[in-house]
UniProtKB/Swiss-Prot annotation:
InterPro entries per UniProt: PsdUridine_synth_cat_dom_sf, PsdUridine_synth_TruA, PsdUridine_synth_TruA_a/b_dom, PsdUridine_synth_TruA_C, TruA/RsuA/RluB/E/F_N
Protein name: tRNA pseudouridine synthase A
Organism of provenance: Escherichia coli O1:K1 / APEC
Catalytic activity entry: uridine(38/39/40) in tRNA = pseudouridine(38/39/40) in tRNA
NCBIfam families linked to this entry: hisT_truA
One Pfam match: PseudoU_synth_1
Lineage: superkingdom: Bacteria
Family from the record: Belongs to the tRNA pseudouridine synthase TruA family.
Region (RNA binding): 107-111
Keyword tags: Isomerase, tRNA processing
UniProt EC number: 5.4.99.12
Gene Ontology terms for molecular function: RNA binding; tRNA pseudouridine(38-40) synthase activity
Primary role: Formation of pseudouridine at positions 38, 39 and 40 in the anticodon stem and loop of transfer RNAs.
Site feature location: Interaction with tRNA: R58, R78, R110, R126, F139
Organismal lineage: Bacteria, Pseudomonadati, Pseudomonadota, Gammaproteobacteria, Enterobacterales
């Protein structure tokens, strides 16, 4: 077939929501369940050809997403309903497409992104939850959310996050730019909301682990600033559990005009 006869290639972006509790992370791996593998299988069924997706951020085992963004290329010409309702019909109940948008050739779910936003949900109660046990992290000591918020503000701007970086992190640099970090209480729930240009491995969970020590009055408010300055992961608290973490939004330049659905999760407004 000559070049003139090649079918056109379409580039499509999707918004994805998933409960990560039954998966070994986003990334496709041999012999274990991954969100990517389930999504690619469903897309391939609708497209009637093999589909490979590229995501904005690869979440770890047990981590959830309400605002994950992916893109893929296909020669299949389908209506939007096929990429949403049709794909959802082929997905397990804990993964769903939220929106679809045709994007130009220069769009890339990861490399076009300008910021990522995560929310970490702590169920702060003496007794553990049952219904949402895989969607929140239980912490039984009373937490002072206002104290946590004040302590976290030293993390704003460009900083070296070595103290909050996993030992096995493969990023070339520990420097990241945090645009906002807010800690708020909603009844028994404490929510840590953090947005940055990018994150080193386990950065949000490591920050939350240390903030909980401050919130429980086990460490002074100044401790977070001291950890940041020390650039030593061994001095910080243990990594917070995966189940409370959600990728809630990814920012892109306005020219792509991607949909911006409510971030959530659950009861949380934007």
């Amino acid at each position: 077939m000559s070049d003139q006869q090649q079918p056109p290639v379409y580039k499509i972006a999707l918004g994805i929501e998933y409960d990560g509790s039954r998966y070994y992370g986003w990334q496709r791996q041999n012999e274990v369940r991954s969100v990517q593998e389930k999504l690619e299988k469903a897309l391939s069924q609708v497209a009637n050809e093999p589909i490979t997706v590229f995501c904005a951020g690869r979440t770890d085992a047990g981590v959830h997403g309400t605002g994950q963004v992916v893109h893929f290329e296909t020669t299949a010409q389908r209506k939007d309903a096929a990429w949403t309702l049709g794909v959802n019909a082929n997905l397990p109940g804990d993964i769903a497409v939220r929106w679809v948008k045709a994007v130009p050739d220069d769009f890339h779910a990861r490399f076009s992104a300008t910021a990522r936003r995560y929310r970490y949900i702590i169920y702060n109660h003496r007794l553990r939850p049952a219904v949402l046990s895989k969607g929140v992290t239980h912490f039984y000591e009373p937490l002072d959310a206002e104290r946590m918020h004040r302590a976290a503000q030293c993390l704003l701007g460009e900083n070296d996050f070595t103290s909050f970086r996993a030992v096995q992190c493969q990023s070339r640099t520990p420097w990241r730019n945090v645009m906002h970090i807010n800690v708020t209480r909603h009844g028994p729930y404490v929510v840590v909301d953090i947005k940055a240009n990018a994150f080193v491995h386990h950065m949000v969970r490591n920050i939350v682990g240390s903030l909980m020590e401050v919130g429980a009055h086990n460490q002074p408010e100044s401790w977070i600033a001291e950890l940041l300055a020390a650039k030593d992961r061994t001095l910080a608290a243990a990594t917070a559990k995966a189940e409370g973490l959600y990728l809630v939004a990814v920012d892109y330049p306005d020219r792509y005009d991607l949909p911006k659905p409510p971030m959530g999760p659950l009861f949380l407004a934007d």
